[in-house]
């Protein structure tokens, strides 16, 4: 598509791009500050808050888009979108997070969630060998999501009892403070979503103006767009020295992508979800390899180390090279 850019159109595009950038920066600040307050006020570790509350908020836009697409009968690419998002979240965003800041936390906080994520990808790999994901298989994958929620609730109670901080060490929890932080959380999440959409739409327009091919725009903007909320949260968390919140958000968002959004699409559509040849041969295996490369060292060593960031970033680059070379994506 070729757009006729006039001076006023260019100014408007640049203005909206700048507004989008401001929205995601300030929204990210509010969002991470509020999430940190929730963790400190409740006594629940930031990793668990990141893996549940923050992940739910950052995946909500993708969930709504997927559900509405399924209601319109257009959920055929749900598996490709979910798997691609998980691979990008891990190979790009967790890579960035770990390279900038190693993450240390008790193994008990992330071990079960890491195993659930790897199990979800492995189960998906097995279920889709016949080129589709059936309704029954979708229900079975939803069971993994139920296990994730149950484990998160148990972990939250356990950590509260283990930490048992002094009451005066916690931030204020009066009505006004609670309302303020809930407002910051909701406003921050909404600003991130709005800002992401403005950046993608106007970034696409700018790319078209300078002659970038539509195929490249589509591939890059879709990939960036699905992971931008997690990326904004990660960058903000790094700036605020909250690495466990970032890693928790990525792991939680990945689990929700695979075990909630994708099965919901199949159930709403009312028929099996097709899996393309590239998905069976490359995308799902690559997703498993990249996630295993990120999580298994942490399970063994009890820490998300910086070298793991470089390692999974390298795996992601290899995946992209194979994809463009063998499948012409």
Predicted feature residues:
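Hydrophobic alpha-helical segments, chiefly the membrane-spanning helices
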Residues: 1-329
């Amino acid at each position: 598509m070729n757009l006729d850019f006039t001076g006023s159109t260019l100014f408007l595009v640049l203005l909206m791009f700048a507004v989008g950038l401001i929205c995601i920066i300030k929204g990210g600040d509010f969002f991470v500050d509020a999430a940190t307050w929730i963790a400190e006020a409740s006594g629940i570790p930031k990793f668990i808050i990141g893996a549940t509350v923050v992940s739910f908020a950052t995946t909500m836009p993708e969930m709504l888009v997927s559900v509405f697409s399924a209601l319109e009968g257009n959920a055929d690419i749900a598996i490709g979108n979910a798997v691609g998002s998980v691979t990008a979240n891990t190979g790009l965003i967790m890579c960035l997070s770990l390279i900038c800041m190693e993450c240390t936390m008790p193994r008990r906080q992330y071990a079960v969630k890491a195993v659930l994520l790897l199990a979800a990808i492995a189960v998906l790999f097995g279920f889709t060998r016949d080129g589709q994901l059936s309704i029954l298989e979708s229900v079975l994958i939803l069971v993994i999501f139920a296990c994730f929620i149950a484990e998160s609730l148990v972990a939250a109670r356990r950590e509260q009892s283990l930490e048992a901080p002094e009451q005066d060490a916690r931030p204020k929890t009066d009505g006004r403070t609670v309302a303020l932080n809930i407002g910051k959380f909701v406003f921050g999440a909404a600003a991130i979503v709005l800002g992401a959409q403005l950046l993608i739409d106007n970034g696409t327009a700018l790319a078209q103006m300078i002659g970038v091919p539509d195929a490249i725009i589509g591939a890059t903007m879709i990939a960036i767009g699905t992971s931008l909320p997690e990326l904004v949260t990660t960058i903000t968390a790094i700036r605020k020295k909250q690495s466990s919140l970032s890693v928790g958000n990525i792991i939680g968002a990945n689990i929700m992508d695979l075990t909630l959004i994708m099965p919901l699409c199949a159930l709403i559509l009312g028929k099996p979800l097709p899996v393309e040849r590239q998905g069976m041969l490359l995308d799902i295996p690559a997703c498993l390899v990249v996630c295993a490369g990120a999580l298994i060292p942490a399970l063994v060593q009890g820490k998300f180390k910086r070298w793991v960031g470089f390692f999974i970033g390298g795996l992601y680059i290899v995946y992209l090279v194979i994809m463009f070379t063998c499948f012409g994506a």
